[in-house]
Design a protein with these regions (language model features):
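GST-like domain detector, emphasizing the conserved glutathione-binding G-site
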Residues: 1-134
Length: 137
């Protein structure tokens, strides 16, 4: 029986893309199902009932959740080609450290960047309004 591999994710999610890239690196064929995060599918709710979030890797009807855990699972399951992690335990731990660091800091940085852009837009709008007032005096 051939393996069935399904990834539940969204195109814009770096976490979904992490899982998909790992599968591509390993040469694993899979079916991709785009999720609507506002109206979560019964499939997502069935296979990730705890967190109800993406990505989810479904391998032979068994779900694996959380992108770093999915990548580790992919590396261990399809271990005949292209290791995703270094062979040396220290280097592997180091790679996991940086992956975890990025997972924890990236959303924070993105949030700060979006807030900066929002404030900048408000500030520029106010400057434009004030300049218009001064021109009309």
């Amino acid at each position: 029986m051939a393996d069935t591999v399904v990834v539940l994710g969204t195109w814009a999610s770096p976490y979904s893309n992490r899982a998909r890239i790992a599968l591509l690196e390993k040469g694993v064929e899979y079916e991709y199902k785009e999720e609507d995060l506002v109206n979560k599918s019964p499939l997502l709710l069935k296979f990730n009932p705890v967190h109800k979030k993406i990505p989810v890797l479904i391998h032979n009807e068994r779900p694996i959740c959380e992108s770093l855990i999915i990548v580790q699972y992919i590396d261990e399951t399809w271990n005949k080609t292209s290791p995703l992690m270094p062979g040396d335990p220290y280097e592997r731990a180091n790679a996991r450290f940086w992956a975890d660091y990025i997972d924890n800091k990236a959303p924070e940085c993105l949030s700060s960047f979006c807030e900066f852009k929002r404030i900048k837009t408000l500030f520029e709008s106010r400057l434009s309004s004030e300049a218009l007032i001064w021109r009309n005096l």
